[in-house]
């Protein structure tokens, strides 16, 4: 006997096929090309109705995930009377799950079964007598909307969008703030150029403009809420002797409007930064503890989502953000970059130049572990303990490389000291002599240390003198050898000249004799 399991928006339908080997038929499409043929081939054997829309959504999600729900299992157990029966299902995952139940079904799910389902879905209202086409389409539409809402609600990727958009907006705000602040200083600098040198903070500069206006009102304006007392005095003194030009009320109104924008942008930037920090602590607490909110958010934004970043190996996380440098190095066969976005992490910043690459590698390895726990842990703890432990290990490694004292891990719990009540001790006069002896012994130790230092210094001085003397002797010997060589060369030259003169003289005398 062959059965076809059909999932509808109203419930599970188990159809009984008249042909036992219908799924093996070579002319299946021609056999099921009309309503009469489909109704002749399939009859309704059992139907399990969904009680509510929530129940329908739950059962549909089970089918999508390839799981057998209790309702479906009960339906199949009631229909397993024939030991040699075959069950045709649409999903391969669902077929594997039904096989694991140990029911007396030969479960089939392949390309041929899709043709059976195509015919069954087309004539489904005719196969199910209690349902008409209009009701079935309405139920299907409602179930489709419910599934869509469920996917949007529980999608982990959608949560990452908040972080990605927030960090992108934060970077844009920083650029805008810098541009506006520079323009404001240049604009107001014509009227009060000395203010930019005294007040370097852009937001404080804008707030001073809003509070003071023209520089002539500076003496009567209270700037204590914006500036410290010393800086306020300097500003007021500079305003009295300023070399700036005068400006009109229209100019001042426009400058104030720009300053107001700067103050508003700065307040919104702080609010956005707090929001990003809270979202990062909620979504990736361990990564946040390890590298910080901004670096962690940039890593997630660069990768696209928390899941895709968690799937990346540590070597990829290490150079994430330095792709151009990496491919340029591979093309020119030079050394590849040691860090990308991780360069801005505080732990990498604490390391010296030669150790930055090593710390970046260790940090990337620990970040990969923290990310996988944040993204994939079923019963995740949001305290960030794993990130804290990983940070402590990276700090210990940094201390080891830099030659500093090793730091203890943050999870070390020290027992509280027990307070014991004892009797008050009487004054012991003998302890005074002991203290004097101890101080004397301490002074002896100090004298011994000083003697040792003096001996070391004397030995070092002797060695330096000996080295200098040896160098002088070597130099003197070299000079003597050079002089001897020069003299030998000179003597050889003189001998040669004498010989040449003698030869010339002999030749001349021979000619005269002839």
Swiss-Prot record:
Main subcellular localisation: nucleus
Gene Ontology terms describing biological process: box C/D sno(s)RNA 3'-end processing; endonucleolytic cleavage in 5'-ETS of tricistronic rRNA transcript (SSU-rRNA, 5.8S rRNA, LSU-rRNA); endonucleolytic cleavage in ITS1 to separate SSU-rRNA from 5.8S rRNA and LSU-rRNA from tricistronic rRNA transcript (SSU-rRNA, 5.8S rRNA, LSU-rRNA); endonucleolytic cleavage to generate mature 5'-end of SSU-rRNA from (SSU-rRNA, 5.8S rRNA, LSU-rRNA); protein localization to nucleolus; snoRNA guided rRNA 2'-O-methylation
Keyword Ribonucleoprotein: yes
Region feature Disordered, mapped onto this chain: 430-514
Domain named Nop: residues: 283-403
Superkingdom: Eukaryota
InterPro entries hit by this protein: Nop56/Nop58, NOP58/56_N, Nop_C, Nop_dom, Nop_dom_sf, NOSIC
Biased composition (Acidic residues): 439-450
Record's subcellular location: Nucleus, Nucleolus
PROSITE patterns to which the protein is assigned, alphabetical: NOP (PS51358)
Gene Ontology MF: a single term: snoRNA binding
UniProt KW keywords: Nucleus, Ribonucleoprotein, Ribosome biogenesis, rRNA processing
Compositional bias per record (Basic residues), positions renumbered to this chain: 454-477, 488-514
Function: Required for pre-18S rRNA processing. May bind microtubules.
Homology family: Belongs to the NOP5/NOP56 family.
Protein's name according to its UniProt entry: Nucleolar protein 58
Gene behind the chain: NOP58
């Amino acid at each position: 006997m062959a059965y076809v399991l059909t999932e509808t928006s109203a419930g599970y339908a188990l159809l009984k096929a008249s042909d036992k080997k219908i799924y093996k038929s070579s002319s299946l499409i021609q056999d099921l090309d009309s309503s009469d043929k489909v109704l002749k081939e399939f009859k309704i054997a059992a139907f399990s109705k969904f009680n509510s829309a929530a129940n329908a959504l739950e059962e549909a999600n089970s089918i999508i995930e390839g799981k057998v729900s209790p309702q479906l299992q009960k339906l199949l157990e009631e229909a397993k009377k024939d030991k040699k029966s075959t069950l045709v299902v649409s999903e391969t995952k669902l077929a594997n799950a039904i096989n694991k139940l140990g029911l007396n079904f030969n479960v089939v799910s392949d390309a041929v079964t899709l043709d059976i389902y195509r015919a069954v879905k087309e004539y489904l209202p005719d196969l199910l007598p209690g349902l008409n086409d209009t009701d079935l389409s309405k139920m299907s539409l409602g179930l489709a909307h419910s599934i869509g809402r469920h996917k949007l609600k529980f999608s982990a990727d959608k949560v990452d969008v908040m972080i990605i958009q927030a960090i992108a907006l934060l970077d844009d705000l920083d650029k805008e703030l810098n541009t506006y602040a520079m323009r404001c200083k240049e604009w107001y600098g014509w009227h009060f150029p000395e203010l930019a040198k005294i007040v370097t903070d852009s937001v404080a500069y804008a707030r001073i403009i809003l509070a003071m206006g023209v520089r002539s009102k500076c003496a009567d304006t209270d700037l204590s809420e914006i500036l410290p007392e010393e800086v306020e005095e300097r500003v007021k003194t500079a305003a009295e002797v300023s070399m700036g030009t005068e400006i009109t009320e229209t100019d001042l109104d426009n400058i104030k409007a720009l300053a107001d924008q700067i103050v508003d942008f700065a307040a919104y930037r702080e609010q956005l930064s707090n929001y990003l920090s809270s979202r990062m602590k909620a979504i990736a607490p361990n990564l946040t503890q390890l590298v910080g909110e901004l670096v962690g958010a940039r890593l997630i934004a660069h990768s696209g989502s928390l899941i895709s970043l968690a799937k990346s190996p540590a070597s990829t996380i290490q150079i994430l953000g330095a792709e151009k440098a990496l491919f340029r190095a591979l093309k020119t066969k030079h050394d590849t970059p040691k860090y990308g976005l991780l360069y801005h992490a505080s732990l990498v910043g604490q390391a010296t130049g030669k150790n930055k690459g090593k710390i970046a590698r260790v940090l990337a390895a620990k970040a990969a572990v923290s990310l996988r726990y944040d993204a994939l842990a079923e019963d995740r703890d949001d305290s960030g303990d794993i990130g804290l432990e990983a940070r402590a290990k990276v700090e210990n490694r940094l201390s080891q490389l830099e030659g500093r004292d090793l730091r203890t891990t943050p999870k070390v719990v020290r027992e509280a000291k027990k307070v014991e009540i004892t009797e008050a001790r009487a004054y012991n006069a003998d302890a005074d002599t002991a203290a004097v002896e101890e101080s004397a012994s301490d002074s002896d130790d100090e004298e011994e240390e000083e003697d040792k230092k003096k001996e070391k210094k004397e030995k070092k001085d002797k060695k330096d003198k000996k080295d200098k003397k040896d160098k002088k002797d070597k130099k003197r010997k070299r000079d003597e050898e050079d002089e001897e060589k020069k003299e030998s060369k000179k003597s050889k030259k003189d001998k040669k000249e004498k010989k040449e003169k003698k030869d010339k003289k002999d030749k001349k005398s021979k000619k005269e004799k002839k």
